[in-house]
Amino acid sequence: MLNVADRQMILDLAAKYALKRVLLFGSAARRDTGYHDIDLAVEGVRPQDFFSLYGELLSRLSLPVDLIDLSRPSRFTQLVREEGVPIYG
C-alpha cells in the first residue's frame, strides 16, 4: 500500500486538478511485497492537464508511476474500475 507522504501528495494533486476519482491498482493495491511502482487510474482529468498531472506525480512520489485515464473505455479500464482501490473521490 502507499506510504503516508505519497498518499497525501496524491490527494493534494487530485484536488489541484479537480479530479473526480483516483484508484490505486496493481501490485501496490494488492499489497504485494516488494512492489516497485504505483499504478493509478484517474477520472475527471482534463485532456490538456493529463501530462502535467503525470509529470507532477512522477517528480513528487517516492516510486515510479503508471497513470491511466478512466475516460477511455476498454476492457482494462473496466477491470481497474471493478478491482481498483479508491483513494480519492
Residue ranges with predicted function:
Residues 1-23, 29-35, 43-89:
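Catalytic core of pol beta-like nucleotidyltransferases
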